[in-house]
Amino acid sequence: MNKEQVSKKIESLIELLNQYGYEYYVLDNPTVPDAEYDQKLRELQQLEQDFPDLVMENSPTQRVGGAPLASFQKVTHNVPMLSLGNAFNEQDLRDFARRASNGTDQPISFVCELKIDGLAISLTYENGKFVRGATRGDGTIGEDITSNLKTIRSIPLSIKEQGTLEVRGEAYMPHKSFLALNELREKNEEEPFANPRNAAAGSLRQLDPKIAAKRNLDIFLYGVGEWENSDLTSHSEHLTRLKELGFKTNKEWKKCNTIDEVIEYVNYWTEHRNDLSYEIDGIVIKVDSLDQQEELGFTAKSPRWAIAYKFPAEEAMTTLRDIELSIGRTGVVTPTAILDPVRVAGTTVQRASLHNEDLIREQDIRIGDKVVIKKAGDIIPKVVRSVVEQRNGDEQEFHMPDECPACGNELVRLEEEVALRCINPNCPAQLMEGLIHFVSRNAMNIDGLGEKVIIQLFQENLVQTMADLYRLDKEELLQLERMGEKSVTNLLEAIEKSKENSLERLLFGLGIRFIGSKAAKTLAMEFETMENLQKATYEDVLAIDEIGDKMADSIVQYFAEEKVTELLSNLRELGVQMEYKGPRKSEQATDSVLSGKTVVLTGKMEKFSRKEAKEIIESLGGTVTGSVSKKTDIVIAGEDAGSKLDKAEKLGIDVWSEQQLEDVVGK
């Protein structure tokens, strides 16, 4: 064969093998024996070996390969991967349905799906090619695990879809694979994984993709982050179209027209969850209409149009051996139960929450008691009650100390608070917890500065304040345990990079009481610089939407403290930037025809890419959304605009051509 013939042969083998793989891994309905598949694969491998320049990206041979990575790169999700609010009973579900119905004028239907117990991931395709796979991370920033995801054979390396498509799903380990993996680990005298979720997450975070390839992972796709060329109008249409494109979706989803149908679905799977070949930990319920999803919108943490029903928590009994106290960054003293190890909901539990002194006293929980442990939402273990009838008289009552176990200062109970608190600003436990918070992902996001490293730096007296982090030098760090040349270099680079963070990250990292990440962003947008915020009065802060009196009081008191002024001065001198880097109110166009308008883009654009058009509209003060609703002001229609244009015309929404957008830009 000449090279052109070889190229055609390779193309036909890839097409055939990918079809066989789709039938086997996605449809679970193979049409050829394994031996025939293997023979065709060997033929392809030989041709690719003889003609390496003809190897194609969507070849099944490209699923595993390449050297192990040094580390995972960070990935920013264009559309955040938010977590869902939780429902634990029928009333929670009915309340969710009522809130959703109150938020829209039209009748609501729901889609119910099994909540797969695995690792949330994102897959991005550009013009049909799989270009990136990432973990959810904190919802805004994840890790690039493309090489590992390529080893999952139910993930297509190419699809027939132009433009950008980002799909979301759950990578998981089937029961059969989990049992086989743990058998192998025990045979090799390795620690077995506690549950399939941990096994799946651990496999996908291996730097060597060949390890992930051996773990027999699978995936279900359940949603869309971005879809450049879609005119679909419902979540159920998304699921159907994803399946048509070759993605593996879970067949057990159901469209429900009433909340009673939803509850019936939930009850069925609560009873039958153990019949499945994979783990589920609940049911996800979503409003089906994309327009209604748009209307309902989001809170800071989750969409208002979806909720996760969590199965009833599992319980187990064990012995409470001791009660330890920990001090948080705000000085709150939290008791934790130390337990004899016990298996609950697939994991081994040795510590559990006791919340506060009042709970211990009210429930008469004693050291030495037999106690019932429950995993709330199958995640956080907590002590539910003591088994009083099993007491033998040796149990000891627990009393909270009068002094802080970390610094010896008197513990106090502030007005209207249940918890005891240490109010010593120099308490070492609070300082250390504050540093751990400062470097965390939602705050300054300093890679390589995990809890263990912070504790080590604190105990070695190298870091006592946030400013000290920016004074660390290479020689000091090299003296620490497990800190080699490369890890020290990477750490110092990460610390240096964090100096360029936008103001909201620094504000959140400072740990001001009552100020979460959303409030920090609101303050940063409003005041734009740390200096402006430091000068702000109580009235200035309270005047901002979403900032209440407790927050305003906390902010003003915080910046009035001398040690805070000194800390911020030190951070400035060390090069930490203190300005908001997002779109500023003072820079937003207010005289533009698009200012304050909600805009939808549809159809194919000739002069602008979707991304360029979106950036232009936002720079002129507009907001771009994905679907047409009564809240839409303008629809900009390119060629083949489809159903979004039809809906805009029915609703009487202003429709622009691409030329009209260009004319506005020209002005």
From Swiss-Prot:
Cofactor: Mg(2+); Mn(2+)
EC number: 6.5.1.2
Record's catalysed reaction(s): NAD(+) + (deoxyribonucleotide)n-3'-hydroxyl + 5'-phospho-(deoxyribonucleotide)m = (deoxyribonucleotide)n+m + AMP + beta-nicotinamide D-nucleotide
Binding site for Zn(2+): C404, C407, C422, C427
Active site positions, chain numbering: K115
Alphabetically ordered keywords of this record: DNA damage, DNA repair, DNA replication, Ligase, Magnesium, Manganese, Metal-binding, NAD, Zinc
Keyword Magnesium on entry: yes
Disulfide bonds: none
Gene3D superfamilies associated with the record: 5' to 3' exonuclease, C-terminal subdomain, 6.20.10.30, BRCT domain, DNA ligase/mRNA capping enzyme, Helix hairpin bin, Nucleic acid-binding proteins
Residue ranges of domain BRCT in the record: 589-667
GO molecular function, one term: DNA binding
Pfam families: BRCT, DNA_ligase_aden, DNA_ligase_OB, DNA_ligase_ZBD, HHH_2, HHH_5
Gene Ontology biological-process entries: DNA repair; DNA replication
GO cellular component: cytosol
Binding site residues for NAD(+): D34, A35, E36, Y37, D38, S83, L84, E113, R136, E170, K286, K310
InterPro entries assigned: BRCT_dom, BRCT_dom_sf, DisA/LigA_HHH, DNA_ligase, DNA_ligase_AS, DNA_ligase_CS, DNAligase_adenylation, DNAligase_N
Domain of life: Bacteria
Keyword set includes Isomerase: no
Function noted in UniProt: DNA ligase that catalyzes the formation of phosphodiester linkages between 5'-phosphoryl and 3'-hydroxyl groups in double-stranded DNA using NAD as a coenzyme and as the energy source for the reaction. It is essential for DNA replication and repair of damaged DNA.
Family statement: Belongs to the NAD-dependent DNA ligase family. LigA subfamily.
Name of the protein: DNA ligase
Annotated organism of origin: Oceanobacillus iheyensis (strain DSM 14371 / CIP 107618 / JCM 11309 / KCTC 3954 / HTE831)
Taxon lineage: Bacteria, Bacillati, Bacillota, Bacilli, Bacillales
Gene that this sequence comes from: ligA
